C-alpha cells in the first residue's frame, strides 16, 4: 500500500450480454490464468441454468444471491499493548460485494464431481434463498463481530 497517494478506483465496464457490472465482477473473479472467455462461458451457462430452474430473470437471482452473502461487518486484528484484539469494522459496499463473490466462488471451487457451471448454479440458488455455505460464512463473520463488539472502541 502506497504512502504517497491513494489509488484511483477503476471503473468496471458492464458485461456484453446482461449489461451488468455485477456479472462482470463475477466473471473477473471466476477467471483463472487469463481465460476470460472460459469464465464468460461458465457464468452465462450458469445463468441460463438459473433461468431454467426458477423461470425468473437470472440477473435478479444473482443480485439477490450476492446481496444475501454480503457481510455488513467484519473483524480485523488490531494489536494494542501487547495483545491482539479482533476489532469489528463496518464493511464498505464495494468490499462487501467483492467478499460475497469471492465466498460464493470459493464454495463452488471446494465442491468436486460436477462442472463449475452446475456448482455455481447450485450455490447462487442457495444464496438467493438465504441458505448455502457462502451465507453461512457471512453469518459466522457476523457472529464473530457481535462477540467482539466490546473491542469496537479500538476502531482505526
Curated annotation (Swiss-Prot):
Organism: Chlorella vulgaris
Keyword Oxidoreductase set for record: no
Record's keyword terms, sorted: Chloroplast, Plastid, Ribonucleoprotein, Ribosomal protein, RNA-binding, rRNA-binding
Any one annotated GO CC term: small ribosomal subunit
Top-rank taxon, per record: Eukaryota
Gene Ontology MF annotations: rRNA binding; structural constituent of ribosome
Regions annotated as coiled coil: none
Matching Pfam families: Ribosomal_S7
Keyword Translocase: no
Known function: One of the primary rRNA binding proteins, it binds directly to 16S rRNA where it nucleates assembly of the head domain of the 30S subunit.
Protein's GO biological process: translation
UniProt-recorded name of the protein: Small ribosomal subunit protein uS7c
HAMAP family for this protein: Ribosomal_uS7_B (MF_00480_B)
Subcellular localization(s) per the UniProt record: Plastid, Chloroplast
Family from the record: Belongs to the universal ribosomal protein uS7 family.
Subunit structure: Part of the 30S ribosomal subunit.
